[in-house]
Every structure is written in structure tokens, then in C-alpha cells.
Amino acid sequence: MTATTAQLLTETTPWLRLSEHSEEIDRSHLRALFASDPDRVDEFTVTAGDLHIDYSKHLITRRTRELLLDLARSVDVEGNRDAMLHGEHINTTENRAVLHTALRLPRDASLSVDGQDIVTDVHETLEKMGVFTERLRDGRWRGATGKKITTVVNIGIGGSDLGPVMVYRALRHYADAGISLRFVSNLDPADLTDNLRGLDPAATLFIVTSKTFSTLETLTNATAARRWLVSALGEDAVTKHFVAVSTNAQPVAEFGIAPENIFGFWDWVGGRYSVGSAIGLSVMAAIGRERFTELLDGFHTIDEHFRTAPPESNAPLLLGMLGVWYSSFRGAQSRAVLPYSNDLVRFPAYLQQLTMESNGKSVHTDGSPVRCDTGEIFWGEPGTNGQHAFFQLLHQGTRLVPADFIGFAQSTDDLPTMSGTGSMHDLLMANFFAQSKVLAFGKTRKEIAAESASADLIPHKVMPGNRPSTTILAPRLTPSTLGQLIALYEHQVFVQGVVWGIDSFDQWGVELGKVQALALAPAVAGEAAPCTGDTSTDALIRTYRRLRHP
């Protein structure tokens, strides 16, 4: 990605024009914008794959969109997009290509990186995953005692956990082979203990996911899980109950995992973009090769849309630029992600890593400091739970929080309402539409007074509206539509990184804490006196030791 070096980004003409235009928008209200433009909904609605995306309830006009696209052109978003898709080393701080999009290319595609045909590599790995998971699902792969595997425990952290957890939770209705998944990520021993409780070691398979096979949390949990298994079944059982997703064969072999049970991936796939790689092995075990392929096809649908759609109808480009609009020009610090599907309960957490680890940067790619806010803070809960938790702030609070509403026309599980004649899903979606409507248009003092409300209560009941939101509708939550949703957000993050001139594909900010934790471990364990170099940490460690061993 290219940072603006000759001229500060915030001093460029497109940026300054948007700053001036933002002052004009201050004088606008969505009520007036809709009233003055009967074509507004059609003008600000796009389709990408199976996703119907209405962004008409945003604090924008046609002029806003024009200026945002001018800014995108000025930093060459399209050229940077093409560089990414062609395998150029756009991750400049690590000198790597960024090719999560290659994970979902069809078999007959052609793409080489550094002289290597990576499409062939990808499909060889997918084939190996498919063969393995088919054996697991149909019972040809048996545990050490001859039992069929009924539980797969994925041990990983970060992208090796958040993606598989989210996808499995979203698509568990497609798990049709009697295999359930559990996920262990946290260094807190309660995580592993809770997930092992009630399991039969003879019917349990562990997938250890770590690129280097040295990640502290993952290897600590994997070692504890190994002890649990060996205590029940003996040392020889390890090869039948552990497989690895890693690129480091030697420590994997030393752990006791057979070479043929190692599934590799590549340094051009970042962890937070890796669920379509062998990192998704546990998901494929649950839902099967065919459904996993549908997930990849969904990703590819949006990849192609992003690559080919013109700017005015390019959903990831438009939504990414809206994120820039609110973050850099409108003072918004966060975005609420509100899936009206309980199956997407982990989707906001997944997006937190995707956007915050990618764009939580304060220097440009050339090392110069960024002069504007970067990195949207994502948060949210499924509807209607969120309505009874934090929607009060969205409707009447002082903070500007753009929201994404995600809903589906068909439910994976529908039940009748209290009357026995209606649909619970229809009632859920009535709430879905109502919330975005009230956020946008609110309720005026005059409208409340007309209802004979107490004069003292009128100010408390006023709903100001003018709160922006995107509505994303799809026919049904399927592997394909889930892949489309994920890719829609992936490419938004990319667009924003290009505009801000930052490297969206490194994560140096997480490294120092790991180093410091290892340095502090002896003092925390009581093997050395606290001498960390700062008095607060030393005092806290001493207090911890006193409380731990009273």
C-alpha cells in the first residue's frame, strides 16, 4: 500500500474537500434527505452476490459519495487492489504477498507468487483436507481403541480460533456427520478444562493450529491436552488423536504427530484471513467438503465483485469509504455490527480482529506518523438481545455510532409466535426493520406532544434520529452467504488501509506483550524477585504472589 509521502494525506485536495463538505452535512437530517429525493433508496442500494445492501440511511448525499470516490481514486485504491490480487508484496513491513483471495480461486485459475504456482498448492491442500475429513466423517478414521471420532477439539488462538469458531457457530446446522466441535484458545486453564469435561478420550481428536508450532497459548494447551489423552489411552494413542495445521514439521513430529497428518499453509495468508485455508480443517470436518467449498465459493463471489464492479456500485469500496467518512471526518469512534441471527453470535468478535488488528496502526507504510484517526472499533451483539442492552445509547446517546444491520429472509429455525399463527422469524425481522427506521428518522417533540405526553417527559421521549446505518439482507444464512459476508468486510478493511496509507496486514503491536510476558514469568511464578524496571508492575507482582500463596 502507498502512503502519501510528498504531501500529507490530510492536506490533499480530496481530503480538504471532504472536510468542507462535512460541515454542510452537519446542517442535514435524514428526514429531509429522504423527503427531498424520491429516488434515494434506489440510488444508495447495491447488490453483491446474494447480498442486498441498502446504505440510504447514511449521512451522505450524492456529492458525498462523489467526494469519497475521488479520495479513493487519489490514493489509487483500484491499483492497490489489483496489486494485492496479483500477488505483489503489499505487506511491506514483512515483505510478503497478501493472497487470502487465492484460497478461494477455482482450480483452473492461474496465479504464481515468486515463481510458485500457488493455485496448485491451494487445491492440493484442499484435496488433502477433503480426503482426511471424509475418512473422519464416515468412520474410516478411528481412534486408538477403534472408536469413531465424535468430537473434534480445535486448539489455536487469534485467527486460528476466531474464524473457525465463528464459522462453525454460524453453520452448525450443516454439521451432518455426528461430529461436534469444541474450541480451546485461552491460556486460562478453565478454557481447556471446560472443553474437555464430559469427553471420551477414545472418541476425541485434537487439531493443533499454529504456523510455527511455538505459539505459547496453543502449545501450552496442546501439551495439557496431550497429557489428558495419554493418561487415559497411553503414549501410542497420540498419532490417532492429534493432527496439526502448521508449517514447522520438526516440532510437530517431536510432539508425536505423524508427518502425513500435518496440514500446511503459507506466509501470504494472515491469521485473521485464514479460515478458508487449512485453519478451517475443523469446520470441514463438521460440515463436510462440499459445504466448505460453498463457503469458499461465497468468498470468491465477493472477490470478483470487488475486482470488477465499477466504483459507484462496488459494495466493499463504498462501505469501506463510508467507514473512512465516519472515522476521519464525522468523529465516530466505533461501528456497531448487529446481526439479527443468533447463528452469527460470534461474527462481531470475528470482525473485531479483522478490522482492529488490521487497521489499528499509527504510522504510514513509510514510517511517518498518521495525522488522522484510523481503525474502526467494531462491537455488537445479535438482535434482539442488543435492543435490551445498548440500543439506548445508539438512539439517544451523545456518541455517533454507525450501525450495520444484517438479516436473512429465511430462518434456519422458525417457530410460531404466542398466537400460534405467526412466525417468530417475521417478528424478529419486524424488529430488525424498526430499529434502523427509528435510528434514521426518530420521533420529534411535536409528534410526541401530539400523543398527549406529559410536558415533563417530552424531552426524555424525543428520538433525534439522524443515526446512520447500513442494512444487509440475504435470502438465508448458508455457507455461500457467510463467505460473501466475510469477504465483504475483508475488502472494506483493505480499502480503508489504502486510504489511510497503512499496512493492514502486519500486527507488530501484539509482539512486545508476548516478549514481556516471557520475561516476567519467572517473577510471577516466584522463581525470581520482581525487577521489571517499573515500580507499578513490581508491586503488582508482589501483591499477586501474596494473594496466590496467603
From Swiss-Prot:
Residue positions of the active site: E357 (proton donor), H388, K514
Catalytic activity entry: alpha-D-glucose 6-phosphate = beta-D-fructose 6-phosphate
Compartment(s) where it occurs, according to its Swiss-Prot or TrEMBL record: Cytoplasm
Superkingdom, taxonomy of origin: Bacteria
A single GO BP: glucose 6-phosphate metabolic process
Pathways per UniProt: Carbohydrate biosynthesis; gluconeogenesis; Carbohydrate degradation; glycolysis; D-glyceraldehyde 3-phosphate and glycerone phosphate from D-glucose: step 2/4
GO cellular component: cytosol
Protein name: Glucose-6-phosphate isomerase 3
Organism in which the protein naturally occurs: Rhodococcus jostii (strain RHA1)
